[in-house]
Swiss-Prot record:
This is Large ribosomal subunit protein uL18. GO terms for cellular component: cytoplasm; ribonucleoprotein complex; ribosome. Keywords: Ribonucleoprotein, Ribosomal protein, RNA-binding, rRNA-binding. GO terms for molecular function: 5S rRNA binding; structural constituent of ribosome. The gene is rplR. InterPro entries: Ribosomal_uL18_bac-type, Ribosomal_uL18_bac/euk. It comes from Phytoplasma mali (strain AT).
Length: 117
């Protein structure tokens, strides 16, 4: 239990370091990812106006569990919603998570459909 708390604290510190460097605008919003034990939450955020442009939750896709298949479907869905709003360029905010596995699959799927970051 204590190991989980420490790893979550390290992730939060990593995310704070990242957030100091990246800012989303209206032309290039921030693609923010949060992964819990059971689901993904992805948002396109305009930090200047402090609004969410669009969001996707892993419950919106028809797959159970938190696996690479779900991450791929969620990445495709956020790309479709962004392209429908005319957003092509985004700033990728991995939320302090390591760029590996599910996060990498989500990023690759959204790139494949046309998002550029």
């Amino acid at each position: 239990m204590i190991i989980k708390k420490i790893s979550n604290l390290v992730r939060k510190k990593r995310h704070l370091k990242l957030r100091k460097k990246i800012i989303g605008t209206n032309q290039k919003p921030r693609l923010n990812i949060f992964r819990s034990n059971k689901s993904f939450y992805i948002q396109l955020i305009d930090d200047e106006k402090r609004i969410t442009l669009c969001s996707v939750h892993s419950k919106e896709v028809d797959s159970k569990g938190l696996n690479i298949t779900t991450a791929t479907k969620v990445g495709e869905l956020i790309a479709q919603k962004a392209l429908a709003q005319g957003i092509v360029n985004v700033v990728f905010d991995r939320g302090g998570f390591l760029y590996h596995g599910k996060i990498e699959a989500l990023a690759d799927a959204s790139r494949r459909l046309g998002l550029k970051f």
